[in-house]
């Protein structure tokens, strides 16, 4: 009886360990996908002063991962890419003109964009994480998910200036 209980306990522990490993690998895969920075940004409207309201289209094999990665992609896009405007909604240039800034300052941006990193202070999902049917597209073996987010650009710029990643707006004069 004791031997059976011991074997059962060992099997349960092995299964839990296997599940933890598989889960960790899928999270690493999602982070690897994010590091490729495959996304598109479109203007959605004007937010309150100092914020941008944008839709981020993120690619991922799992829709739930794409929704979370959209926040990282939104902040990344505001800093490094900017976005085009639409009729009645102006586009915005990237916060930096230095295309190599992310690689040059990797010691800052790697932890900044890590899961739960500092980027979370500047972005929020406006539709409570729900995605409309038209914003969930199957493209080959993966999904293209559109999520509307609000990015506090004024606070983001101030934080990046304080960290020395961007020059202040008044530094050119």
Where are the regions that the model predicts?
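Bacterial Sec-dependent N-terminal signal peptides
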Residues: 1-27
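Domain-level marker for long, solvent-exposed, non-transmembrane regions
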Residues: 23-173
């Amino acid at each position: 009886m004791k031997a059976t209980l011991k074997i059962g306990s060992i099997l349960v522990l092995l299964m839990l360990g296997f599940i933890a490993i598989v889960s960790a690998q899928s999270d690493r895969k999602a982070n690897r996908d994010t590091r490729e920075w495959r996304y598109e940004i479109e203007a959605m409207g004007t937010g309150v002063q100092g914020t941008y309201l944008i839709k981020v289209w993120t690619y991922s094999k799992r829709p739930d991962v794409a929704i979370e990665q959209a926040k990282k992609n939104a902040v990344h896009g505001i800093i490094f890419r900017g976005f085009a405007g639409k009729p009645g909604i102006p586009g915005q240039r990237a916060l930096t003109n230095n295309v190599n800034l992310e690689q040059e300052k990797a010691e800052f941006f790697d932890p900044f964009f890590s899961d739960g990193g500092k980027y979370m202070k500047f972005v929020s999902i406006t539709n409570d994480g729900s995605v409309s049917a038209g914003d969930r597209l199957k493209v080959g073996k993966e999904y293209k998910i559109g999520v509307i987010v609000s990015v506090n650009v004024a606070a983001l710029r101030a934080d990046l200036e304080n960290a020395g990643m961007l020059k202040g707006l008044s530094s050119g004069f």
